[in-house]
Amino acid sequence: MRKPYGLMLLFMVVSVAAAQPTKQTANVEQVWLGYFNQARFSDKWGVWLDVHLRTKEDFAKDMAVALGRVGLTYYLADNTKLTAGYAFINFFPSDNHRNISQPEHRPWQQLQWHTKYSKLRTMQWLRFEQRFRRKIKSDDELAEGHNFNYRLRYNFLLSVPLSKQAFAPRTFSGVVSSEVFVNFGKEVVYNTFDQNRFFAGFAYHLNAHDNLQFGYMNVFQQLAAGNRYRSTHAIRVFYFHNLDLRNAEK
């Protein structure tokens, strides 16, 4: 029981330390919406899909990001799996590209594992990304070629039931998570630490395979200039849909 609490405490300390105010920290308010689907169609194979929309500022003003991600999953065990896939991200017009969107192509690989205890559950993943972001010529025109860097992400999520029937359908649980992002590559100069995403909220378990998570998320990000930071205060709503199709085939 001590191990997951110790890991979560470590990431909470990282979150709080990273979020200390600086002279050049910009604060924005956003809404993050997401849908996740994991479908298992055999003992060893499955597929991954998630899609996201994020607003830009003042919670409902303009769009910032649209993202779609797909992957093929290989199950090492029921609670441990490897996934590799591709993501496409569209960054809507922003400060350095006011009249055009910036596309990004992002291959990714991931190790994910779940641990169940009598009164809590944890989920962790280690994700490796290769980011190809289209270069920008001006506010109105994309340039040829892409900026490239690698990014490593580690996510730790802790779920605690809020009823005697732990994680049963039509019950709630409390959810706390922290995800740390690290950049590396030739084009990364100042922001090796990319960002930390800290989330605290609730999950409503609709049934054995669906749950709705909602709550507050803070994203503390170091920008490429190195001396500028962004603190995003977000309302986050994610829907998780997990399907086991093996029984349907029998």
Where are these regions (language model features)?
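Residues on the lipid-exposed face of transmembrane beta-strands in outer-membrane beta-barrel proteins
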Residues: Y35-A39, V70-Y74, Q109-T115, F128, ...
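Transmembrane beta-strands of outer-membrane beta-barrel pores
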Residues: V51-E57, Y86-F92, T115-Y117, F128-F132, ...
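Residues that define the transmembrane beta-barrel architecture of outer-membrane proteins
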Residues: N27-V31, A64-A66, P103-P107, H146-Y154, ...
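Transmembrane beta-strands of outer-membrane beta-barrel proteins
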Residues: V47-L49, L82-A84, L120-L126, L152, ...
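Start-of-domain marker
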Residues: P21-G85, I89-F92
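Outer-membrane beta-barrel transmembrane domain signature
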Residues: L126-N211, V219-F220
